[in-house]
């Protein structure tokens, strides 16, 4: 399950609906894993607000991981400090690769039912904050060393699987530029809601190209754009937004909820949908079957 953009502010009544929805959706779906793709907090005190969200998930005794968004370290604590707080929770799976840009680059492996092999690989990545390139404004991007980290690990999993790529999925906060290319492609099939333009970085650092080169990524799941929850199938990869999870501490025009991703062990397909208030499920789709034009 993916939560995104909780934008929690501790002791702010506008965040109450976000915390309620997290609890409600967890009760309904009972997921095996939760990944929160950034912008978890949106005000001070940072530690209390951060602990409130992670503690809520942890209390369900569900393993969880996080990736950072561009607003998380704007509330008086650094990514490293927030990472250390996350590490204090019993059910936290978040780690970070040493020597790689960011503080939430890690891999989660999903084992086969008989526990003999890796059935799926989840790449969780820090999409960073804002551009650090001179004269280039806007949002940050996945850096070259992060892309190389992904490529090298992908090669290892493929090699261990007899030269066949293992079905893999990527989770991070800021959408890559290909989200814009995909919705402009009239041949690409889309499901869900698109109410704002893609707020991607101005520079394309090549993450999608690396994914195509490795041949393992089946789906990408991001947040950042609160009024989008669509999924579009482009060049054999599903580019999907999570559903905005937050309350009214920041702009939003969609009722809040979560995205659910259900994997199949054989890797031929996966199913995804949005879960809302009272367990309502919408936009259920099987990928790739429901995204192929007749």
Predicted regions and their residues:
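His/acidic metal-ligating clusters that form di-metal
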Residues: 30-32, 121-123, 136-229
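Short hydrophobic patches on amphipathic alpha-helices
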Residues: 26, 57, 211-212
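Active-site-proximal beta-strand elements of phosphoester/diester hydrolases
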Residues: 1-10, 119-129, 171, 238-244
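Active-site environment of divalent metal-dependent phosphoester hydrolases
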Residues: 9-11, 42-45, 66-77, 130-133, ...
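N-terminal active-site segment of His-dependent metallophosphoesterases
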Residues: 1-52
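Binuclear metal-dependent phosphoesterase catalytic core
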Residues: 107-112, 116, 122, 207-214, ...
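Extended active-site neighborhood of metal-dependent phosphoesterases/phosphodiesterases
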Residues: 51-163, 259-264
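Divalent metal-coordination and catalytic microenvironments
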Residues: 5, 22, 34, 39, ...
């Amino acid at each position: 399950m993916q939560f995104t953009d909780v934008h929690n502010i501790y002791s702010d009544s506008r965040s109450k609906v976000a915390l309620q929805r997290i609890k409600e959706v967890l009760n309904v779906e009972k997921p095996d894993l939760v990944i929160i793709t950034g912008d978890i907090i949106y005000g001070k005190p940072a530690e209390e607000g951060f602990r409130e969200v992670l503690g809520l998930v942890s209390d369900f005794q569900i393993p969880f991981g996080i990736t950072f968004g561009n607003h998380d370290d704007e509330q008086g604590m650094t990514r490293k400090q927030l990472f250390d707080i996350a590490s204090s929770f019993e059910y936290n799976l978040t780690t970070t690769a040493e020597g790689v840009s960011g503080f939430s680059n890690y891999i989660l492996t999903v084992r086969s039912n008989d526990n003999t092999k890796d059935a799926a690989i989840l790449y969780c990545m820090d999409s960073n904050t804002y551009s650090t390139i001179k004269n280039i404004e806007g949002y940050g991007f996945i850096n070259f060393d992060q892309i190389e980290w992904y490529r090298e690990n992908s090669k290892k999993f493929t090699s261990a699987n007899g030269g066949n790529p293992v079905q893999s999925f990527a989770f991070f906060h800021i959408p890559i530029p290909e989200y814009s290319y995909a919705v402009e492609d009239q041949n690409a099939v889309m499901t869900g809601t698109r109410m704002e333009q893609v707020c991607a970085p101005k520079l394309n650092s090549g993450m999608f190209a690396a994914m195509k080169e490795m041949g393992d990524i089946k789906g990408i799941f991001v947040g950042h754009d609160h009024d989008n929850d669509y999924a579009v199938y482009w060049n054999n990869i599903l580019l999907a937004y999570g559903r905005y999870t937050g309350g009214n501490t920041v702009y939003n025009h969609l009722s809040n909820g979560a995205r659910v991703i259900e994997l199949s062990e054989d890797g031929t397909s996966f199913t995804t949908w949005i879960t809302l208030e009272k367990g309502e499920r919408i936009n259920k789709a099987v990928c790739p079957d429901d995204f192929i034009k007749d």
